[in-house]
């Protein structure tokens, strides 16, 4: 991708659309800094708050919790009056965070906050939640629905997922070393991040009925559900994996959550049509795109070179996109995108 020249459309950024990643990081850190209490005795916490999932020590096993939501993708579903796939997104955003640590999702609860209830909308959301649970082989054991008129406008869909794994099989990223390779896995599209910026561009410059070169409309493409990377756990059973990364909000900057090394992307995966359209129409800087969206890579392995053949043969579309370097940072073709 590249910066567009000569466009009459003002350059768009995620911050201008209302999401300041740097401010969000500072705000989250301010919250985490106050979470100092740790349980004593059995079932203590392993590691620190801030990884993709939180771990609880259960002897030879660990339990893990992840929480996430669909975000403003719900507003696109509202615009199209189609909520059938947002439940898949909700499940995916949670289970993919568990897969990063080689955890098996086993149970899920959803949380719906809304200003008004619609049985039709709830049925469609339930359809997607059930399909997501099927893909992840996971139980949905309950949930909470809150009607909060005056506090909520629209509907916010989120969930919490419980995972489990033998303690000695958990992957935290601590084994990552310079010289490891980064193997990218294709996304299904925009997934569930960067929608605030995407919606701003669509609503200012086009419509959800606008066709893309891939034969879909913008609305159809955006509502394509987040890919559930259930197959990644099979790979960890057969070869050495030092770390994994779910490319969500913040794009490539998610690699910084794994280790204090450099992550250099030299050969990115093919960029889907939706991202090319957003960049060209919104006149978005290339680095800004990779700081905001997954850009076609929704998940990645960090592994020694000897593991590449096993990964590529097991996961369709997986291939080497870069490597780990000594100097901390995240680079895209040599450009520091921090």
What are these regions (language model features)?
Residues 2-5, 10-18, 27, 121-139, ...:
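Glycine-/charge-enriched secondary-structure boundary and capping motifs
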Residues 14-38:
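Acidic/polar, glycine-rich intrinsically disordered N-terminal extensions of enzymes
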Residues 19, 23, 86, 193, ...:
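A generic structural signal for residues located within well-ordered alpha-helices
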Residues 32-188:
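Glycine-rich phosphate/pyrophosphate-binding loop regions near the starts of catalytic domains
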Residues 70-74, 166-169, 190-192, 250-252, ...:
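Short, acidic Gly/Pro/Ser/Thr-rich loop/turn segments
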Residues 170-173, 193-197:
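A short secondary-structure junction signal
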Residues 182-190, 244-251:
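A structural signal for small-residue-enriched, beta-sheet-centric alpha/beta enzyme cores
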Residues 195-206:
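Short, compositionally biased
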């Amino acid at each position: 991708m590249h910066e567009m020249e000569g466009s009459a459309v003002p350059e768009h950024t995620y911050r201008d659309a209302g999401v300041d990643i740097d401010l969000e990081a500072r705000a989250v850190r301010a919250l985490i800094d106050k979470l100092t209490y740790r349980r004593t005795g059995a079932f203590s916490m392993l590691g620190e708050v801030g990884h993709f999932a939180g771990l609880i020590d259960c002897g030879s096993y660990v339990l893990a919790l992840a929480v996430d939501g669909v975000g403003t993708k719900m507003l696109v579903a509202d615009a199209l009056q189609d909520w059938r796939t947002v439940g898949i997104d909700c499940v995916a955003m949670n289970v993919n965070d568990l897969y990063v640590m080689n955890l098996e999702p086993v149970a899920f609860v959803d949380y719906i906050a809304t200003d008004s209830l619609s049985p039709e909308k709830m049925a469609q959301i339930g359809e997607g939640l059930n399909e997501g649970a099927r893909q992840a082989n996971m139980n949905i054991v309950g949930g909470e629905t809150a009607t909060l008129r005056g506090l909520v406008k629209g509907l916010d869909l989120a969930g919490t997922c419980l995972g489990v794994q033998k303690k000695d099989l958990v992957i935290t990223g601590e084994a990552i070393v310079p010289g490891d390779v980064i193997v990218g896995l294709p996304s299904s599209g925009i997934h569930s991040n960067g929608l605030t910026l995407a919606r701003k561009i669509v609503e200012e410059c086009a419509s959800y009925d606008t066709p893309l070169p891939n034969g879909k409309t913008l609305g159809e493409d955006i509502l394509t559900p987040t890919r559930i990377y259930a197959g990644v756990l099979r790979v960890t059973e057969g070869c050495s994996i030092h770390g994994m990364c779910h490319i969500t909000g913040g794009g490539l900057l998610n690699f910084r959550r794994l280790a204090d090394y450099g992550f250099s992307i030299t050969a990115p995966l093919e960029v889907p049509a939706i991202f090319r359209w957003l960049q060209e129409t919104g006149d978005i800087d290339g680095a800004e795109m990779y700081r905001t969206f997954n850009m076609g890579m929704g998940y990645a392995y960090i592994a020694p070179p000897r593991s590449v053949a096993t990964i590529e043969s097991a996961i369709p579309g997986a291939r080497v996109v870069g490597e780990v370097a000594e100097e901390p940072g995240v680079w895209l073709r040599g450009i520091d995108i921090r």
